[in-house]
Amino acid sequence: QSAFFTQQAIAVPAFPSKQQDVDPQWKLMSDWIRDHTAEDAIIISHPWKLANFTWMTERATIAKLKLFPQTKEAIVEYYERLNDLSGGAVAKIYFGNEKLHQRKTVKAISAGFSNLNTAQVQELMTMYQSNYFLTDDSHHLDLPIVHTQAAYILYGRAYKEKN
């Protein structure tokens, strides 16, 4: 038992790590977000991926599929937020004629998020009072890049000059 305790004590500085299913590059990106954004920053992030976003970055996000609310009002808002993040895919799924399947739902929400264009992202940033949009390197937007870390890109809000 003492060997196990020693091993655990040595691992504390590296926590969280792959043992907690945390990709080292994601840990670096989340550390950067925590160290370089305001504590009250709202960061738009993928609703399915990076379920540990809030825990790792100590920043707010819009909605995560795994973090389901418990009150009627909050549940309605949750689905509205997922619909916003998926470019309208949630409404199509839940009000369509097809039977609901978890895999199909997750796939549609993920695809919807990954297909958001620059104008849609800017609209989300305005709607949710966010200055940041976190995505992966396959999601190209015409927005300023604030920071990159391996496959992760943090975009910033594009401000227009007032005349």
Model-derived segments and their meaning:
Residues 1-21:
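Transmembrane alpha-helical segments
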Residues 7, 20-104, 124-139:
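Short periplasmic/luminal acceptor-recognition loop of GT-C membrane glycosyltransferases, typified by
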Residues 12-16, 103-108:
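Short glycine/proline- and acidic residue-enriched helix-loop micro-motifs
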Residues 107, 111-163:
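Aromatic/acidic, Gly/Pro-rich catalytic loop(s) in extracytoplasmic/lumenal soluble domains
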